[in-house]
Amino acid sequence: MPLSTVALIFGGKSTEHEISIISAKSIAAVIDPFRFQVLPLYITHEGKWFTGEFAENILQLDLAEMLRSTSLDATGNTLRQMAMHTGQQGFDFDFFKAGIDLAFIALHGSYGEDGRIQGLLDTFGIPYTGCGVLASAVAMDKALTKLCVTEAGIATAPGITILSSEYFADPKSTQKSIEEQFTWPVFVKPASLGSSVGISKVHHIGELIAALETACRYDSKILVEKAMQGREVEVAVLGNNAPEVSITGEIEPGSEFYDYADKYIHNAAKMYIPARISPELQEQVRKDALRAYKALGCRGMSRIDFFVDETSGTIVLNEVNTIPGFTDISMYPRLFAASGLPFNELVEKLLQFALETPSGARS
C-alpha cells in the first residue's frame, strides 16, 4: 500500500516565522514513517515556497538555540540569506494537484492561522489539519472572537476596538476616549497577531501613545482591554464532531505578562499542569473552552486561554489559538501528554481528523 504524502507547511510571512519552523521540526520527528511520507514545504519571510533539500535543511536548524543566543532579527536575517543563496527553484504549485494527499499546517500567525492557507488548500481539494477558513479567520481576529463567544454566554474582558486610521486621524480624541472608559492598567494589542507580538501593558496615560503606535505597526485594527486579575489558564481541545478537552494548565509569566521573549527566548515563564485552581473552577474552564470551540466552529484543534480569578470565581476568555505551538515548551502538546495522549499519538490523531473532513466541508 503506497504511503500517503503529507505536506508539512511551515515558515511563512508572519512575525511567528521562526516558531513555526521549531513546531514543524517537532512534528516531522514523530509522523509515522510507515503510514506517511513527509514533504517539507517551507515558505520564506517574503512568501516564496520551497520543498526538497532546502526545506529539509531549514528543518535541521536549531532555531530555538539561535533565538536564545542571538536575536529574533539576527535569526530572521540568517534565514533570509539562506533563501537568497539556495540556488534552488521555488515550489511548483502544479504539484499540489496530484502529489499531496493531505497537509499539516504548522504556520503560526498571519497567512497561516487566518484562513488564507486554508482557502488555498480548499481550492486545490487537499484535506488539512485544524480549523477551516471561517473559524480560522474569526479566531485570528480577537475583536471578532469576543463578539462570537460573548453571544455564546462566555465572559470576556471589557474592551473597545480602534482602527489605526481613526487613531492617526485624531490621536488626542482616541487617548481621551480610552482614559474615560477604562481604569489603568489596560492592554493594547493588535487584533490579529499571536505570540503576544505588539502587545503592551499600559499603566498610565503617559505610556498609551507608545503602546498604540506599537500596535498600529502590526495591524490596522487595535484592541484595548481592561487588564484582568487572576491566573492565566489554558486548555487544549482536539477533535471534530466529538472534541476532547485536556486538563487545565497555568502559565506564570516571568515578567509582567507572557510576551514573546518570555515564551521563546528567555524561557522565563513557569508552567503548572494542572492549573493551581480549584477542581470546580478547572471543570468550568474546560466546559467554557468546549463551548467556545463549538461557538467558533473549530475543528481539529485549538488552544483556548482564560484568566481565572479564584477569589471571585470569575472566568474570562482571553483568546483562541487555532494553530497552537508544537515546540518542546508549548502548552498544547504538554496538556494532552498530561491527559494521557503522547505527542506522536496527538499528531496521528490530527492527521486522522484532517482525513475525516472533506476539503471545503469545514467552517
Curated annotation (Swiss-Prot):
Keyword annotations from UniProtKB, A to Z: ATP-binding, Cell shape, Cell wall biogenesis/degradation, Cytoplasm, Ligase, Magnesium, Manganese, Metal-binding, Nucleotide-binding, Peptidoglycan synthesis
Residue ranges annotated for the ATP-grasp domain, each copy included: 146-352
UniProt GO cellular component terms: cytosol
Catalytic activity: 2 D-alanine + ATP = D-alanyl-D-alanine + ADP + phosphate + H(+)
Any Gene Ontology biological process: regulation of cell shape
Main location: cytoplasm
Record-linked PROSITE patterns: ATP_GRASP, DALA_DALA_LIGASE_1, DALA_DALA_LIGASE_2
Gene Ontology terms for molecular function: ATP binding; D-alanine-D-alanine ligase activity; metal ion binding
Cofactor binding: number and manner: Binds 2 magnesium or manganese ions per subunit.
UniProt function note: Cell wall formation.
HAMAP family: Dala_Dala_lig
Name of the protein described by the UniProt record: D-alanine--D-alanine ligase
Species name: Chlorobium phaeobacteroides (strain DSM 266 / SMG 266 / 2430)
Gene behind the chain: ddl
